[in-house]
């Protein structure tokens, strides 16, 4: 009898605690977490829409696909960002999900909706996941239709798609005849989509503005241009800091592909701009042929990421293929490279071919170095040679400049390069002063250091 009394008492207390939790605590939904076992046996498609706002930045609300009413935090008058992931061969949640949600909410009180289709993307058979992309798009179309019926507008819809998610975003856009506000494709998937007609992949007509980042065109990503503007960091292939051999395991396969996401996330913080240069090829960019962005005045050259839509009015007027833009990055967050033009006017009587290495030193003693190009520069008497220099640190102000000239030859005589004028022009931060040095000699393989001075005539 006593045992029964204690049991009933515990049961009563348990009910009180349960009742108290139901009133004071809300249920937080999380991204589906699967494993390699699920990948092997396969998963049926199930889509979960996880809503985050500034009112619930860490506790996602699970939205009903067929009903956009009755949700505590969904405000259809806000701009809504749909974030859609891609193929998940191991079933684990994307490592970048929490970070991208937080960064969006730091900028503005969006409706941030994570499109969790991990059940459907988790499989060892990539073609099965690819086949589900249309089905996911159909589900998103139903939900957006409900939002529109509650007062949302297509202008306020922004879709960010990663890999297969980029094509899902495109399929949604097609169902609205390209009227949704914006699509950003982050390294759209290449396998099974390369060479397909526009109706079977992401296309620039799928939204009012489509911007695309290509970071693994020789692997898992799509190579050709797809948007109004296509960004190719580091030429769109081997990303700095990523493994170069298969000995690194899975990182070798996914690092380049994922870099597009991390570059985009870096753009949300705006700690520095990832400035890109419209150009026909990566080689043309590397040799400094593509730094004229007068066509975008009063704006500067386009920047990758969230703020790329500032260039929308210029870009959407162009015929397809649209604008391809190239730039280099550093190996680590925030990935920014700071560009300078280095102009040499030489007075050596003989033509010299060689390589230039330049170091910049700040007032506090920090040093950053740039080897200007993989190809030898040609220095002719009284003919200006302009080289594009790239640094992974921002030096302001610059207290000293060091320059080394080399021909790359290990045998034979050592040459001199007689410099009439060297000019350092900031390109990333164009409001900074142009610096010069006049009448000096570079001895091959000898580092020459000097204090720069303001140029006598910046029009030279």
Curated annotation (Swiss-Prot):
GO BP: lipid catabolic process
Pfam families reported in the protein's UniProt record: Lipase (PF00151)
Compartments reported by the entry: Secreted; Cell membrane
Membrane topology annotation: Peripheral membrane protein
GO MF annotation: an example: lipase activity
Record bears the keyword Chaperone: no
Any one cellular-component term (Gene Ontology): extracellular region
EC number(s) from the headed UniProt entry: 3.1.1.-
Leader peptide range in chain numbering: 1-24
Record keywords: Cell membrane, Disulfide bond, Glycoprotein, Hydrolase, Lipid degradation, Lipid metabolism, Membrane, Secreted, Signal
Record: active site: 163 (nucleophile), 187 (charge relay system), 257 (charge relay system)
Annotated glycosylation sites: 67, 75, 177, 289, 366
SUPFAM superfamilies given in the database record: alpha/beta-Hydrolases
Function comment: Hydrolyzes specifically phosphatidic acid (PA) to produce 2-acyl lysophosphatidic acid (LPA; a potent bioactive lipid mediator) and fatty acid. Does not hydrolyze other phospholipids, like phosphatidylserine (PS), phosphatidylcholine (PC) and phosphatidylethanolamine (PE) or triacylglycerol (TG).
Annotated protein name in UniProt: Lipase member H
Organism whose genome encodes this protein: Xenopus tropicalis (Western clawed frog)
Lineage summary: Eukaryota, Metazoa, Chordata, Craniata, Vertebrata
Gene (name only): liph
């Amino acid at each position: 009898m006593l045992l029964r009394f204690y049991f009933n008492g515990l049961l009563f207390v348990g009910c009180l605690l349960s009742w108290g939790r139901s009133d004071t605590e809300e249920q937080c939904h999380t991204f589906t977490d699967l494993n390699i076992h699920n990948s092997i046996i396969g998963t049926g498609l199930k889509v979960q829409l996880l809503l985050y706002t500034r009112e619930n930045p860490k506790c996602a609300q699970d939205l009903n696909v067929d009903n956009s009413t009755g949700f505590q935090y969904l405000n259809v008058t806000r701009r809504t960002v749909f974030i859609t992931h891609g193929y998940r061969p191991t079933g684990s949640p994307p490592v970048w999900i929490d970070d991208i949600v937080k960064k969006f909410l730091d900028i503005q009180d969006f409706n941030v909706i994570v499109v969790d289709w991990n059940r459907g993307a988790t499989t060892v058979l990539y073609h099965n996941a690819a086949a589900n992309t249309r089905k996911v798009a159909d589900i998103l179309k139903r939900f957006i239709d409900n939002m529109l019926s509650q007062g949302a507008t297509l202008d306020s819809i922004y879709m960010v798609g990663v890999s297969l998610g980029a094509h899902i975003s495109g399929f949604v856009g097609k169902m609205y005849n390209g009227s949704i506000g914006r699509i950003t494709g982050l390294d759209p998937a290449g396998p099974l989509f390369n060479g397909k007609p526009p109706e079977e992949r992401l296309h620039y007509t799928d939204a009012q503005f489509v911007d695309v980042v290509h970071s693994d065109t020789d692997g898992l990503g799509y190579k050709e241009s797809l948007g109004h503007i296509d960004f190719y960091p580091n030429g769109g292939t081997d990303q700095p800091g990523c493994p170069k051999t298969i000995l690194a395991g899975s990182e070798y396969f996914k690092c380049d592909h994922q870099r597009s996401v991390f570059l985009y996330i870096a753009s949300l913080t705006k700690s520095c701009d990832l400035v890109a240069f419209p150009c026909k090829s990566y080689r043309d960019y590397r040799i400094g042929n593509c730094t004229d962005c007068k066509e975008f005045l009063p704006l500067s050259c386009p920047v990758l990421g969230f703020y790329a839509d500032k260039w929308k009015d210029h870009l959407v007027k162009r015929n397809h293929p649209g604008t391809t833009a190239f730039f280099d990055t550093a190996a680590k967050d925030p990935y920014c490279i700071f560009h300078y033009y280095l102009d040499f006017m030489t007075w050596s009587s003989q033509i010299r071919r060689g390589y230039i290495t330049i170091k910049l030193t700040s007032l506090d003693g920090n040093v950053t170095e740039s080897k200007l190009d993989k190809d030898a520069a040609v220095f002719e008497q009284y003919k200006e040679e302009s080289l594009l220099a790239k640094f992974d640190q921002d030096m302001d102000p610059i207290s000293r400049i060091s320059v080394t000239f080399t021909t790359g030859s290990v045998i034979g005589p050592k040459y001199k390069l007689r410099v009439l004028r060297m000019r350092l022009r900031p390109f990333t931060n164009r409001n900074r002063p142009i610096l010069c040095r006049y009448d000096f000699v570079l001895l091959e393989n000898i580092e020459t250091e000097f204090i720069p001075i303001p140029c006598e005539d910046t029009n030279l």
